C-alpha cells in the first residue's frame, strides 16, 4: 500500500499496488476538487512505430500519426527525469507514444525503474510481432496491458489473427489484459455484435 497526503488540497489517498484499487478521503470535510500532482501520467516514450501501415491496413487511423512520424524515441535518461519528479506522488504511468512501448530498445530498464520508484507501469500495444520476452516483461512489471483491437469480422471470420493471438498469449501468461477498441460510426455495430455474441477472446479483463 502507498499512502499519499495532499497538503494543498487537504485529502489523503491509499493506493493498492497489487490490484490498482485507490481510496481517497478528505481531511477537512470538503470534497477535493483537484490534486497537487497527477496520480497517473501518460508518457509517450515512442517516437515512431515499428508497425508501419499495420493499423491503417486494419481500417483504423492512428491518432498518434505513427505511420507518418519518425521522431527519436524518448531516451531512458529523460524518462528517468520524469520518474524521479513523480516518485511519491504518482501511482501509475501509462506508456505510449507513436508506437508500441514494448518495442522501445530500453523497455526493460524503463519498466524496472518504474517499479524501483513504486510507480506501476501500464501500456497499450498493437501486439504486432510481440515476443515471448516482451510478454514476460509485461507480466513481471506491468499492472495491466491493453491490446489495440485491429480485427474485423469478414465473412464470419476474424480479419487479423495477429491481434487475437497477441491477446490470447498475454492472457495465457497471466497478464491483466484489456482491449482498446476504437468505436466509430464504422465500428459501432460490430462492437455491439461482439458484446452480444461474447466474441472477444476469453479471459480479458475489460
What do these predicted ranges mean?
Residues 1-42, 57:
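Flexible, acidic/Gly-rich N-terminal and inter-domain linker regions that tether
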Residues 25-28, 64, 149:
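Active-site donor-binding loop signature of nucleotide-sugar glycosyltransferases
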Residues 76-96, 104-206:
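Radical SAM/AdoMet-radical enzyme domain recognition
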Residues 17, 51, 104-106:
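Residue-level recognition of conserved structural "scaffold" positions that shape functional pockets
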Amino acid at each position: 500500500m502507498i499512502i499519499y497526503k495532499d497538503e494543498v488540497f487537504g485529502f489523503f489517498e491509499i493506493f493498492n499496488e497489487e490490484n490498482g484499487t485507490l481510496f481517497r478521503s478528505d481531511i477537512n470535510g470538503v470534497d477535493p476538487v483537484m490534486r497537487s500532482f497527477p496520480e497517473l501520467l501518460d508518457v509517450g516514450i515512442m517516437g515512431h512505430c515499428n508497425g508501419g501501415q499495420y493499423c491503417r491496413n486494419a481500417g483504423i487511423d492512428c491518432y498518434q500519426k505513427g505511420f507518418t512520424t519518425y521522431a527519436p524515441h524518448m531516451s531512458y535518461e529523460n524518462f528517468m527525469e520524469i520518474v524521479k519528479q513523480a516518485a511519491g506522488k504518482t501511482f501509475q504511468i501509462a506508456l505510449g507514444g507513436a508506437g508500441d512501448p514494448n518495442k522501445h530498445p530500453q523497455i526493460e530498464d524503463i519498466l524496472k525503474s518504474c517499479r524501483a520508484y513504486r510507480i506501476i507501469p501500464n501500456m497499450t500495444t498493437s501486439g504486432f510481432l510481440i515476443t515471448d520476452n516482451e510478454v514476460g516483461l509485461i507480466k513481471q512489471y506491468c499492472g495491466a496491458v491493453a491490446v489495440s483491437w485491429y480485427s474485423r469480422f469478414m465473412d464470419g471470420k476474424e480479419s487479423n489473427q495477429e491481434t487475437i493471438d497477441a491477446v490470447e498469449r498475454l492472457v495465457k501468461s497471466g497478464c491483466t489484459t484489456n482491449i482498446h477498441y476504437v468505436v466509430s460510426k464504422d465500428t459501432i455495430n460490430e462492437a455491439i455484435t461482439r458484446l452480444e455474441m461474447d466474441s472477444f477472446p476469453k479471459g480479458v479483463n475489460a
